[in-house]
Every structure is written in C-alpha cells, then in structure tokens.
C-alpha cells in the first residue's frame, strides 16, 4: 500500500504570524506548493507573495528573531535553535502533546469606565501598552482591550495601572494587602524580642528555592516572612508601600527566571 499523505509541502519565507494555540494565521512570501499530481518528478507551483494559511501550532526552526515578542509566553509557538538536536527533539515532543481541548485562564479583569488611556481623542496613560511583553493589550479608542488568548498572566499591567481599571484576578491587590497585614499581626503576637520583620515576596519558583535553602542550609532568618503570589510582576508599589505601612522594615522580591524585571524595576523605583 502507498503511504497516505495527510499534510502539504510548501516552500517560502514566513513573514509574520498572529494568533495563539489553535488559531494561528501565518503570512508567507515567495510561497510555492508542491504539486503531487502528474507523472515523473513533482514540480513547485508558481511563486506568489502574501500567501496566508491557518494552523494550530508553529514549530519555528528558522533561527534568528522569533515571530512574537516574549515568544516563550505564546501558547502553541515553539522557537528552537535547529542546530541543537536535543532542543529540537524536546520541541517536537512538546508539540506532539498539544492535542485535545484546552482551557485558557482569564488572568485579568478590566473596567473600561475607569481607564485613563484617552479622553476626547487626547492620549493619556499608556502604562499597560508599554509594559505588556506579549502584545496582548491594544488601544480601543478611549480604552484599552486585552486579548485573553494572548495574555500570559504576568500581572504587570495591573500593577502599573494608576486608576484600577485592570485588576489581576489570581491575586487582587486587596487580597494581597490583607495577607500582608495578617502576616504582620501574627508576627507581632509571637515576636517577643525579635527584630523588625522583613517581607520576602516570591512565586512558585521562589517557593522551591526557599525549600532547598531550608533543606540544605540554614533557611530564612527568623524575621524574614515569605509570602507567595501567583505572578511576581503583579506585586506593585501599592503592595510594597502597604507592607511598609503595616510595619515591615523592608520588602524583598525574589525574582524568578521568567519575571518581567523592567516592570518590577519601575514599581520599585516608584515605591
């Protein structure tokens, strides 16, 4: 039996791509398709510009600049160095598992009436537009809109929003502030002669680091109180100042490898 051919073979230059897992749209220049009909050697079709197609997953082996900003946060897009065979094998395996039905977490909530992006066609605040690493936020007249399919949930937009128009659903600011106050109240009840407490903010990656420090070393000092949040970038100047107002002597942020250091740096400077 002849093997089945349930895929197309094309050649061209991938110019751009939009979308996310399950809904990518790609634009290809110098597009040629292999014609499997006829006798003898297969021939390529006539080249054309601006060819468009849809796909569920993109495995990018071109090298050079990725198609998306913060490409590691774009679901369904796998960019690897084609010269490194183990990385290619790992990416192929990962792509092969992207089958089935997936749920996308809605990380943030917006309240357009509070948005200070623009009024009467006069541009104002663009904090979230400037800081979003994935390009999920776009201008929509007087307001901004967030594409939930592209949003990676870093939380930087909520931390930088001056009006409260964007709130981070996993760790709302009000919840984080209550947790900080509860830590402070608990410490005061048992502190005795211990020095002023210090707050250590971390995520799941930091939790593992703290656990290893306790297992293989001395762990945290007695007056260092850890608090875990979903996304480090969602911890902004308001939360930091709230911690200081509660009685903490200082606030330390334990960065993870994927943390947005630019957004965090802006909030630290503001605080």
Residue ranges and their predicted role:
Residues 13-15, 143, 172, 232:
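Short, solvent-exposed coil/turn elements at secondary-structure transition points
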Residues 1, 91, 113, 153-239, ...:
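Flanking helices and flexible, charged tails adjoining ferredoxin-like Fe-S electron-transfer domains
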Residues 49-51, 160, 242:
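Hydrophobic/aromatic ligand-binding patch that stacks against planar heteroaromatic rings
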Residues 1-131, 135, 196-210, 225-227, ...:
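Ferredoxin-type iron-sulfur electron-transfer modules and their immediate structural context
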Residues 121, 150, 232-233, 260:
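Alpha-helix N-cap/helix-initiation motif
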Residues 74-76, 184, 215-217, 266-270:
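Short secondary-structure boundary/capping segments
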Residues 236, 242-253, 258-271:
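C-terminal, active-site-flanking charged/polar segments
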Residues 68-70, 108, 122-152, 156-173:
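Iron-sulfur cluster-binding cysteine motifs and their immediate structural context
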């Amino acid at each position: 039996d002849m093997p089945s051919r349930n895929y197309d073979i094309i050649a061209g230059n991938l110019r751009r791509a939009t979308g996310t897992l399950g809904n990518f749209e790609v634009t290809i220049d110098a597009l040629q398709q292999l014609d499997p009909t006829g006798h003898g050697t297969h021939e390529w079709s006539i080249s054309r510009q601006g060819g468009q197609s849809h796909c569920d997953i993109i495995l990018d082996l071109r090298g050079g600049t990725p198609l998306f900003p913060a490409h590691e946060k774009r679901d369904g897009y796998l960019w690897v160095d084609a010269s490194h065979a183990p990385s290619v094998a790992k990416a192929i395996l990962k792509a092969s598992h992207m089958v089935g039905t997936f749920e996308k977490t809605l990380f943030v909530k917006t309240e357009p009436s509070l948005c200070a992006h623009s009024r009467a066609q006069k541009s104002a605040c663009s904090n979230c537009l400037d800081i979003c690493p994935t390009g999920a936020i776009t201008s929509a007249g007087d307001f901004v809109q967030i594409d939930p399919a592209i949003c990676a949930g870093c939380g930087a937009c909520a931390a930088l929003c001056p009006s409260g128009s964007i709130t981070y659903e996993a760790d709302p600011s009000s919840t984080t502030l209550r947790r900080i106050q509860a830590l402070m109240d608990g410490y005061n009840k048992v502190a005795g002669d211990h020095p002023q407490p210090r707050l250590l903010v971390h995520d799941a990656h930091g939790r593992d680091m703290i656990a290893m420090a306790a297992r293989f070393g001395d762990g945290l000092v007695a007056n260092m109180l850890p608090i875990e949040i979903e996304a480090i970038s969602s911890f902004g100047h308001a939360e930091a100042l709230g911690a200081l107002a509660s009685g903490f002597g200082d606030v330390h942020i334990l960065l993870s490898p994927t943390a947005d250091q630019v957004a965090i740096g802006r909030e630290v400077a503001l605080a």
